[in-house]
Structure formats: structure tokens, C-alpha cells
Amino acid sequence: MRIKVGETVAILAGKDRYFIDENGQRKVKTGKVLKIFNEKQRIIVEGVNMKTKHHPPSKDQEKGSITKQEGSIHISNVALIDPKTQTPTKIGIRFKKGKKIRYAKKSNNQLDDIV
């Protein structure tokens, strides 16, 4: 996967794509990547695709509870936010000193440091 945990991504598709700001304008929703599932090509983004989980009563809890948690979304529905230009961009791969280096295709900025 070309996106890593902790990076900020923009949501490109789905029910959580937009939010309305204080001026009434539609803005693209962004969030930090919390977890990556490589086999399924899905990621969990902070505050996006919230699901309601019902917990039944158990021996420890007399009452059941309802919690909200993030659901996964497909990797094709997000784009990395370029740290320098703050715009959504695709990610390309270059080889430098025998190592793979990621770069933003829109601005040509290098995303990884050469070790």
C-alpha cells in the first residue's frame, strides 16, 4: 500500500465524502489513517464511516451499551493529502539509492526521506 498509518487522507467517495462548514460550503472530509488491512485493501480513517455497535448485557455489565466506532473504507476511495500543498494527490514511486521513495504526483514533492 502506498498510504501509511498516521498520514492524512481526503475521502473521495462514499457517504462521508463531504461535510458542511460554517459558511454553508461543502468541503471534502479528511482524517488520519488509524489502521491498514493490506489483504483486503481497506483502511480505517479517524472519524469517517462511523458504525453503531450494540453490546448486549453480560456478567460484568448489567446494562447493555451502544458505542460508535470507525468502519473500514476501500483504499481507492481516499487520496493522500500532500503535506506541502495541502491538496489531495496520487502517489508515485521512484528508486533512489536502491530504495523505493514515494512522491506526490501533483506537486512532485518527495514524501519519504532517503535513509
Swiss-Prot record:
Show the GO MF annotations.
rRNA binding; structural constituent of ribosome
Q: Which GO terms describe its biological process?
A: translation
Top-rank taxon of the source lineage equals: Bacteria
Keywords of this entry? Ribonucleoprotein, Ribosomal protein, RNA-binding, rRNA-binding
Which residues fall in a coiled-coil region? none
The UniProt entry's GO CC annotations, sorted and at most eight, read: ribonucleoprotein complex; ribosome
Entry keyword annotation includes Ribonucleoprotein: yes
Q: Which InterPro entries match?
A: Rib_uL2_dom2, Ribosomal_uL24, Ribosomal_uL24_KOW, Translation_prot_SH3-like_sf
Segments carrying the region annotation (Disordered) are 49-68
A Pfam family this protein belongs to?
ribosomal_L24
Task: Please give the subunit comment from the record.
Answer: Part of the 50S ribosomal subunit.
Which PANTHER family does the protein's record reference? Answer: MITOCHONDRIAL RIBOSOMAL PROTEIN L24
To which protein family does this belong? Belongs to the universal ribosomal protein uL24 family.
Please explain the role this protein plays, according to its UniProt record: One of two assembly initiator proteins, it binds directly to the 5'-end of the 23S rRNA, where it nucleates assembly of the 50S subunit.
Protein's recorded name: Large ribosomal subunit protein uL24
